[in-house]
Amino acid sequence: MALDFSNATVKAWRRENGRVGVRNHVLILPVDDISNAACEAVANNVKGTLAIPHAYGRLQFGEDLELHFRTIIGTGANPNVAAVVVIGIEPEWTQVIVDGIAKTGKPVTGFSIEQKGDFETIRQAGWKAKEYVHWASELQKEDCPISDLWISTKCGESDTTTGLSSCPTVGNMYDKLLPQGIYGCFGETSEITGAEHICEKRAANPETARKFKEIWQAYSDDVIFAHQTDDLSDSQPTKGNILGGLTTIEEKALGNLEKIGRTSTYIDAMGPAETPSKGPGLYFMDSSSAAAECVTLMAAGGYVIHTFPTGQGNVVGNPIVPVIKISGNPRTLRTMSEHIDVDVTGVLTREMTIDQAGDALIEMIIRTANGRMTAAEALGHREFSMTKLYRSA
């Protein structure tokens, strides 16, 4: 019999805009790649802060620049972040990031290196970071309904066990928690190839179906038809997928869609790093299938917990969002157990039902929201990877 989570609560931080965060980070956030060193210096000096270095932010333009801003602003705005120190080389773009994060109501201050240099920027930013750490450390958790959580998903290192156990486990979780009012998110546009017609039918309404089809068709036009091939050179499926028994992208796509459950429909199709705007429910996000990129985009969209089914074992984490790993592969549980949070191997040995596996995942989500570190957090995996649409000027 399935457990009843209808009255479940978590201990979490209620932010200024009403959202709920399950972590309490003070970020030192670079606007651009050449501000990484200053951010890391501040984080090294002030205990309790976290720098997120990245590779981009200079000479970008058009939609690529918009996505860059959206990702950086969304990362700082995520409810798992209590306060933000922003550092950029130039004041104008730094202020764009500060203004975007400030809309949440959380404390945020920006510093530009230009005409000050590293030493003075690090000194000023360090004082502000210390002030924020003192403030954030006194914030108190409160009881919040589980419906306040925003939970995203993406799978990685998939094999034949993924579509049979760990992906349906996530789908079962969504079928149980979405009716309670959570926000959910799935994506991986390339990994829906071959099952796009099925995904289109799972849309809640014709407008959402149309938006999804446009997103998928744009990917198809840009990649498959532009290069006149459906051979993605061992990228989709990967060598690991093939060794694990998934020989075609269609097989992989069918397993991918198991993550959205049996009864759930998605209410909107969003661009990368966009924030849901149509209320509680399941959303599709146009995103890369690369693990670090996808989790980064969904975290920037505001999701506070990420569920990650894996067959052969994936080690990815994220700086601000706990990533919960689920696996049903007995060999992976023997060889990579340090990376797995939820063991659903019993599904394949018929010692556990999908319903029981879904309950186990929900229990782990609650424990994680209450403060349990995920395997990725405990092992220091903080992968942050920006999605770039085209080359810089």
UniProtKB/Swiss-Prot annotation:
Record's catalysed reaction(s): (2R)-3-sulfolactate = sulfite + pyruvate + H(+)
Compartment(s): Cytoplasm
GO molecular function: sulfolactate sulfo-lyase activity
GO terms, biological process: D-galacturonate catabolic process
EC number: 4.4.1.24
Entry's Gene Ontology cellular component terms: cytoplasm
Alphabetical UniProt keywords: Cytoplasm, Lyase
Coiled coil: none
Pfam families: GD_AH_C (PF20629), GD_AH_second (PF04295)
Top EC class, one word: lyase
Proregion span(s): 1-2
Free-text function comment from the UniProt entry: Together with SuyA, desulfonates sulfolactate to pyruvate and sulfite.
Subunit structure, interactors included: (2R)-sulfolactate sulfo-lyase is composed of a SuyA and a SuyB subunit.
Stated family: Belongs to the UxaA family.
Protein's UniProt name: (2R)-sulfolactate sulfo-lyase subunit beta
